[in-house]
């Protein structure tokens, strides 16, 4: 019997992502509090409105250093409302590294990078291909 490897291609579906203001504030304060280390967490959407990011989930065992955040993804809860990741950069550039892009491709549909000085204008969002996307604050 011959088994062929299934070609993993994602269908690009347009989602108008939104993030709750208080969730973004929590991300900002979390990034500030752990500086100069990187902050990292998972993004979770509302149960009823699947395009609104409403909270973050801290993974047990996450390693946060000055140049990296290592997620222990085997500790991720079984939760279909987890849609991506958030992590901070101690530099002023919210641009994904090669390691970030690898994570984006493997886990989640939307990802946020917040950069120093950690405020409402120092973050960017990306899809799983590393393409910048817009997220509305609600």
Please provide the spans of the model-predicted regions:
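Conserved beta-strand-loop surface patch within small alpha/beta domains used
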Residues: 1-82, 91-138
């Amino acid at each position: 019997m011959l088994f062929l490897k299934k070609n993993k291609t994602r269908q690009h579906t347009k989602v108008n992502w939104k993030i709750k203001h208080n969730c973004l504030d929590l991300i900002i304060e979390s990034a500030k509090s752990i500086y100069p280390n990187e902050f990292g967490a998972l993004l979770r959407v509302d149960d009823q409105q699947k395009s609104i990011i409403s909270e973050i989930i801290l993974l047990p065992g996450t390693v946060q250093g000055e140049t990296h955040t290592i997620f222990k993804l085997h500790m991720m809860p079984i939760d279909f409302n987890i849609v991506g990741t958030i992590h901070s950069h101690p530099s002023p550039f919210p641009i994904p590294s090669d390691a970030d892009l690898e994570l984006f491709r493997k886990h989640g549909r939307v990802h946020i990078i917040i950069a120093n000085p950690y405020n409402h204008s120092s973050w960017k969002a990306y899809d799983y291909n590393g393409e910048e996307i817009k997220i509305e604050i609600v």
